[in-house]
Each structure stands twice: as C-alpha cells, then as structure tokens.
C-alpha cells in the first residue's frame, strides 16, 4: 500500500529487504558478503548495542533503493571496516515513521569504511521522525559517488553533535533521477509537506576532509529553520568536471515545493545558515565548467567566520 509519494505502508513492499532485525540487542554482524540485494540490505530497527564489522555489500548500481546499511531508531551502533557499493545510500541513519515507537538514533560510530554510491555514501535522514545525536564518522574513503556526506532532514527529528573527520571524498554526477548533484558535503532542512515541519540541525563539525568532485559544499536551511553552528577545519574542496551530465544545479529534493534548482556552483554555498566557520579551508578548481562561480557564496547568513580561508573565483 502506498500512503504517499515517499512512504510505503502495510505488509507489501515492492522488493524484499535482505536482513531485517527489530528490537534486538547485543548483536554482531561480521565477516560476510551480500551480492545484488533487491532492496535494503541490512536494516536493524529499534536495536541497541549493534556491531557491524568487516562485511562486504556489492549491489547492482542500476537497482534503485538497494541501500547498504540502514540503522533505524538504533543506539550504540559501531560500523567498521566495511566495503559497500550500492545504488542508493551506502550507510543511512534513519528514524522512520514505521518504527516510531522506538527511541532516537544515537551514539553511532562509523569508521574505516570504503564506499561507492549513486546516491549518498553516508546519510542522516531523510526519514527522521525521531532525533539523531552523538554521531562520529572517521577514517573513511568515498569514491565515485553522487554525494559524500549528507544530512537531509524533512521530518520533525532534530540533529545535533555530529563529527566527521579524516575522510577522502570523490563525487561525480549521475543521472538526474538520483537525488544529488555531486555535492561532497550537504546539509539541508526542509519541510516534507504542508503538515510536517522539519527538525533543527546544529553543532556539526568537519575536520581534515579532502573533497574532489563536480560540485561544492551546500548548506541550506530556511528563514524559519536555520542551520546553526557548523565548523569546517582543514577541509580542502576541488571542483572538477568529469561526467557527461550538466553542472550548474543544486538538488533540494525531497520536500514541500523543492526540486532541482538551476544555480551556479560555488565551492561553499550557504543559505539560511548561521554561525558557520571555515578554518584552514580552501577551494580550488580543476576542469572548469561555465557554471562554476565563486569560492564562497552566502544568502541570508549571520555570523560566518573565515579563518585562513583561501580560494579564488573560477
């Protein structure tokens, strides 16, 4: 049964999840391989104390919604030393409406993973009716992906205290049907629909990150719901055109009246984001396309701090 554009309800799903564990504690997934999952591969929901280690997920990059690992309303989760290739998000933290009886997604560690995704390699959201907090992502390599690190809030859950460090990100654009336009880092908070107000995003940090891709960093809130307190430290961003797909877009989907926007690409694009710090951070240009523009572009932002920020216009 399809409830609306984004949610499927009832017993029927178009394709089966490979592994679904609900309300299970003290569980270990270790040292196995999954090939060609038809839908989400590993979906723990409402679980506590979960270790996911040394697993390989090799899904068909043309099969949409074949997510890799989807912790949903889970706590005390460690995902380490995994390799994931899939035609959707490799690792996606969720607090889904279907499992809303469980608590927040909190105390999460992701480290030592190699990831390839036609969507986002590591994402928080978009399903987020509950909160997300206390999350660390480190020592990962993301390559050939449509997006690298993504926080997309569309429901009422809040996001706070998320730290990313020591990560290499390579992005390229895929077919426009996929959400994203090759942003290595993206944070957005938009209402899903007329009856759903998006939660608040604050206290996010990025340290020692190297990004090479077809688009720059995007942070977009709204006038009613600004994104707050984001710090970039020792982050290097290089924009370089490599795919056949057009540049000059930002993808705001999904959300109320949100689509792909035609807009020149900046190294850092900030809209309705307050107290953003760019420290020891640079923007460089590789293969330049006509739609590349400024190192930094801001709209309706307050409290932006630049400390040793370098970058010329394209």
Predicted regions located by residue number:
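Extracellular/periplasmic carbohydrate-active domains that bind, remodel
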Residues: 1-314
């Amino acid at each position: 049964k399809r409830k609306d554009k984004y949610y499927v309800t009832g017993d029927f799903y178009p394709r089966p999840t490979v592994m679904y564990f609900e309300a299970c504690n003290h569980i270990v997934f270790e040292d196995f391989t999954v090939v060609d999952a038809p839908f989400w591969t590993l979906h723990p929901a409402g679980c506590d104390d979960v270790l996911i280690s040394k697993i390989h997920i090799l899904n068909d990059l043309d099969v949409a919604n074949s997510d890799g690992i989807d912790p949903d309303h889970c706590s005390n989760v460690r995902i380490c030393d995994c390799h994931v290739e899939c035609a959707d998000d490799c690792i996606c933290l969720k607090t889904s409406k279907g499992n809303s009886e469980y608590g927040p997604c909190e105390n999460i560690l992701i480290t030592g993973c190699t990831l390839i995704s036609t969507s986002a390699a590591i994402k928080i959201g978009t399903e987020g009716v509950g909160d997300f907090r206390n999350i660390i992502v480190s020592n990962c390599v993301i390559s050939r992906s449509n997006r690298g690190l993504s926080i997309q809030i569309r429901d009422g859950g809040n996001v706070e205290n998320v730290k990313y460090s020591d990560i290499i990100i390579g992005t390229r654009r895929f077919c426009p049907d996929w959400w994203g336009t090759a942003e290595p880092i993206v944070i957005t908070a938009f209402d899903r629909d007329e009856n759903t107000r998006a939660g608040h995003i604050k206290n996010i940090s990025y340290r020692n990150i190297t990004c090479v891709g077809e688009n720059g960093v995007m942070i977009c809130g709204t006038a009613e719901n600004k994104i707050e307190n984001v710090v970039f430290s020792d982050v290097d961003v290089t924009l370089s055109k490599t795919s056949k797909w057009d540049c000059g877009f930002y993808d705001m989907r999904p959300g109320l009246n949100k689509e792909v926007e035609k807009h020149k690409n900046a190294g850092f694009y900030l809209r309705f984001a307050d107290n953003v710090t760019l420290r020891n951070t640079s923007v460089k240009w590789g293969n330049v396309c006509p739609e590349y523009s400024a190192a930094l572009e801001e709209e309706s932002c307050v409290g932006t701090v630049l400390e040793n920020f370098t970058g010329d216009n394209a």
